[in-house]
Amino acid sequence: MLIIIISILGVIFLITWGVITYLGRSQTLSVKSVENLNKDLYLIHLTKPDNMTWKSGSFAKIELADTKESQQNVSDTVSGATRNSKGKEQKSRWLTIASNPDEGEILILTHNSGSFYKKTLADLTAGTEVKMSWLDSGLSLADDKEVLVCFASDVGIAAIRPIIKELEGKREIILSHLDKGVTVFNEELIELANKTTNLIYKTDTDLSQSKETLKNAIDKYENKATYFLAGQPDDVKLMKTFLKDNGIDSKNIKSSSFRGLK
């Protein structure tokens, strides 16, 4: 009996170690280009290794090459990260991948908050190398036929865009984007909605409009739909409360907060 228990524990250990090794493995990527879309908003294009894949809506740890230490004591508006206890800037952040593997490149949509990491990221030139590891996703669907209702605020659209591109035409999808000036994927999503009968895409200027869109979906689908929320933490929290107050079960709500966006 003891031998069996030890064997089972050994198998569990090997599986756990394998998962950690797989998720934590690092790959070196090259910068293709960096677009300054407006003011502090940037779209970063990275090369995609042929053997690299990920789930739509995934995030990953992006590590920059060794750089000079910053003297500014500021925080990162997207990740919320600050200096470590020794006063040094961390050179890695968790960022959402705004593209799918079949697009042939890795897209990162982010604000330049003024932190050393974000300023360095925004100033990267073509050919510069970064490291990516720990690919993961908190947005997933259990049923391949259920309706998907999405809310994204600000750069939270980065998490929702690849999901829409993967699933458009395969199920009914409703997307409300509280864009706050982040319109980089707007034309693309409008075009998808125009040619896809079961895709509704709305851009909203305030939270009340987004609530109205979601309320219409709640009245129609109730708990027969899955609700994805992504973006500014305060917005995500408010929308999560709004869904629950209107009878949506917590198990049907999945979220991805961009910590630090205020």
Model features per residue range: what roles?
Residues L14-A126, D179:
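Ferredoxin-reductase
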Residues L2-G24, S113-K262:
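FNR/FR-type flavoprotein reductase catalytic core
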